[in-house]
Amino acid sequence: MSKVLKVGLLLLLVAVAASAYAVAEENGAPKENKQLPQIDDYGVTNKCPANQPFKWNCNYCTCGPEGKDASCTRMACPQH
């Protein structure tokens, strides 16, 4: 692979990463200083505050419009 192609691919990767970060910020990604409700039993009850962000264990979620079926990050949480 030529050096020019490698540099081009690297620049493309950086641009995609920067775009993804900007979109996450626009979509209201949780800020570290923002206090979100912690719902530890979401995995059992599947209930959450409709259309609201919350934390489930170490993951960030946004609840669905009917108060269930949230969309969450999928980080592996450390065991306590």
Curated annotation (Swiss-Prot):
InterPro entries assigned to the protein according to its UniProt record, in alphabetical order: Pacifastin_dom (IPR008037), Pacifastin_dom_sf (IPR036201)
Disulfide bridge positions per record: C48-C63, C58-C77, C61-C72
Secretion signal span: 1-24
Tissue-wise expression: Expressed in the venom apparatus. Low transcript levels are also detected in other tissues.
PROSITE patterns noted in UniProt: PACIFASTIN (PS51446)
UniProt superkingdom: Eukaryota
Pfam families: Pacifastin_I
Maturation-removed propeptide residues: 25-47
Membrane-spanning residues: none
GO CC terms of this entry: extracellular region
Transferase recorded as keyword: no
UniProt keywords, alphabetically: Disulfide bond, Protease inhibitor, Secreted, Serine protease inhibitor, Signal
Location of this chain's protein in the cell: Secreted
Family label: Belongs to the protease inhibitor I19 family.
Entry function: Parasitic wasp protein that may interfere with the host immune response. The recombinant protein inhibits trypsin activity and prophenoloxidase (PPO) activation, an enzyme essential for both clotting and insect innate immune responses. It does not inhibit activity of chymotrypsin and protease K, and has no effect on phenoloxidase (PO) activity.
Entry protein name: Small pacifastin protease inhibitor
Species assigned in the record: Nasonia vitripennis (Parasitic wasp)
